[in-house]
Amino acid sequence: MIRKLLLILGISVASLANGQSLATATFAAGCFWCAEEAFEKVPGVVSVISGYTDGKTQKPSYEEVSSGRTGHTEAVEVKFDPGKVSYEKLLDVFWVNHDPSYTDRQFCDHGSQYRPGIYWHDEEQKRLADASRVKYGKLKTFKQPIVTPIVKASQFWPAEDYHQDYYKKNPVRYKVYSTGCGRYSRLDELWGKLRK
């Protein structure tokens, strides 16, 4: 069963030669296209799936989530090898790739479907997420308080195929969107050298 799942994900058993199994992390950082790009660049991350979480309907579509009526937020599910990258490192990537001072928007995207969040899968992830919020709150790189919630993970629904790897499949459109949205200039303003 595990071997079949790994093959479905496009992961060879050899990639887990260290004897550990993959772990899962779930984050919402606004537009899932941008979050997917940020996490896919991290060594030790095996896959990143764009999708929806923290909502009240089954198998939501992009159109339904975009309406704001399903309660879902755009998120990414990150599969990673904990022998190669720590959950703490993924938390660092998360923090510097979103604006933690808003509860219902990220950059030019407004609405509850763009709310940020850390969705923990076990008590250790919760503990580490709480500690990371304290750590980033003490940095005082900006004036507003951190309002990003840390919530128990719920059902994650993969988004439609055309959303997966959007930044790779549509690089020009993605660049126009992410630049026009002011995402990177705002992140640099918030986090400065921490983003490098």
List each language-model region with its residue ranges.
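Short, low-complexity, intrinsically disordered N-terminal peptides in bacterial proteins
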Residues: M1-I2, G10
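Hydrophobic h-region of N-terminal signal peptides that target proteins for export
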Residues: L7-G19
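Flexible coil/turn and secondary-structure edge motifs
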Residues: I2, N18-K196
